[in-house]
Amino acid sequence: MSNYAIILAAGKGTRMKSDLPKVMHKVSGITMLEHVFRSVQAIEPSKIVTVIGHKAELVRDVLGDKSEFVMQTEQLGTGHAVMMAEEELATSKGHTLVIAGDTPLITGESLKNLIDFHVNHKNVATILTADAANPFGYGRIIRNSDDEVTKIVEQKDANDFEQQVKEINTGTYVFDNQSLFEALKDINTNNAQGEYYLTDVIGIFKEAGKKVGAYKLRDFDESLGVNDRVALATAEKVMRHRIARQHMVNGVTVVNPDSAYIDIDVEIGEESVIEPNVTLKGQTKIGKGTLLTNGSYLVDAQVGNDVTITNSMVEESIISDGVTVGPYAHIRPGTSLAKGVHIGNFVEVKGSQIGENTKAGHLTYIGNAEVGCDVNFGAGTITVNYDGQNKFKTEIGSNVFIGSNSTLIAPLEIGDNALTAAGSTITDNVPIDSIAIGRGRQVNKEGYANKKPHHPSQK
């Protein structure tokens, strides 16, 4: 039989105090909805239906054509939300997973185990449960003397005995699909919340003598539903440790997992070392044997093998093998550093292509430039690429020596093997094998300093 999935993503999430729909808040680089969607893939669903409502288009854009969508215009409870999928699924034969879009820690493995348990035990409904140290706020799983599930009781409807139960409903279920939609016709709003509870279908199945089971999670953390920023931070912490652990298993040294912020789609090669307080975001990819030292921050960066990045920022750039960056360097979007390049302390590079073995050791700005191989930038070099309205390009050949404190005013071309004298302002193209000097001639006026207040003779 086929598997199906319904993802509940219509809620506003008032306690988040945010303009974003709750499921759009991110955990480790992607939205909670995307985390859930990825985990759902483990059951190989023939169709996924996402129930949307608040700011529906934002939610729809996240999944695009990977899901069908149905609207829940009024928030009348989880049962009502599932009813919205009736037109898409009601006549289909198979098993339907129902899961909330704000449960980013649930794993695909657990969902696969849930489906297998449901099928193997021939249940009409199977509840995903967990044991909670503090079950307050959760629906409780009530069992009879034979350990069979008899019902789910919500917190506000639970009596004193039921509130002592530790086994909680995670809000994730598997149902026989056609039985689910038949039972939904019989639920009502006669409860403390005045809503259509999806949990009421469990009681309907039990009254009809149908088999209901429960599969208990091994890790309570997977059950976390995010309702506020506190829970969001908890989810982030758990996910961060999970990600760091997987990288360590794969041969990466993460010196302090508590302080490493690694997004879920980041790739890191073996023998690389991630020191404390490193942040790796987006689609960043790190090669083998690379060292990222304390405080480095990379966003959508492509980094090769045997690279050293010391307390620096790299954004949307390509760093080739053997490059050294930092400390305190800033590699801005659109930059490509070829093999063996050295970008030193307090150097900023933006939208530039830098050739092999080129060095900019300190206090330099290179913007909108194309630079050849074996170029040396002296300290204090500036490419002047912006006139207030337009950006202009600087082209520098190979084996060029740029003297310290040179100002290169674009558009400008400097040929191979050329050099600029220290302190020069270069406004014209420099031919191959030439030296360019663009500074005022020094004039010494002997004895002139005697008249100045700083001179000992004036004190």
Swiss-Prot record:
Mg(2+) binds at D102, N227. One of its GO terms (biological process) is cell morphogenesis. It catalyses: alpha-D-glucosamine 1-phosphate + acetyl-CoA = N-acetyl-alpha-D-glucosamine 1-phosphate + CoA + H(+); N-acetyl-alpha-D-glucosamine 1-phosphate + UTP + H(+) = UDP-N-acetyl-alpha-D-glucosamine + diphosphate. The keyword Cell wall biogenesis/degradation applies. It comes from the Bacteria. SUPFAM superfamilies: Nucleotide-diphospho-sugar transferases (SSF53448), Trimeric LpxA-like enzymes (SSF51161). Residues 230-250 are annotated as: Linker. In the N-terminal section; belongs to the N-acetylglucosamine-1-phosphate uridyltransferase family. In the C-terminal section; belongs to the transferase hexapeptide repeat family. Catalyzes the last two sequential reactions in the de novo biosynthetic pathway for UDP-N-acetylglucosamine (UDP-GlcNAc). The C-terminal domain catalyzes the transfer of acetyl group from acetyl coenzyme A to glucosamine-1-phosphate (GlcN-1-P) to produce N-acetylglucosamine-1-phosphate (GlcNAc-1-P), which is converted into UDP-GlcNAc by the transfer of uridine 5-monophosphate (from uridine 5-triphosphate), a reaction catalyzed by the N-terminal domain. This is Bifunctional protein GlmU. The gene is glmU.
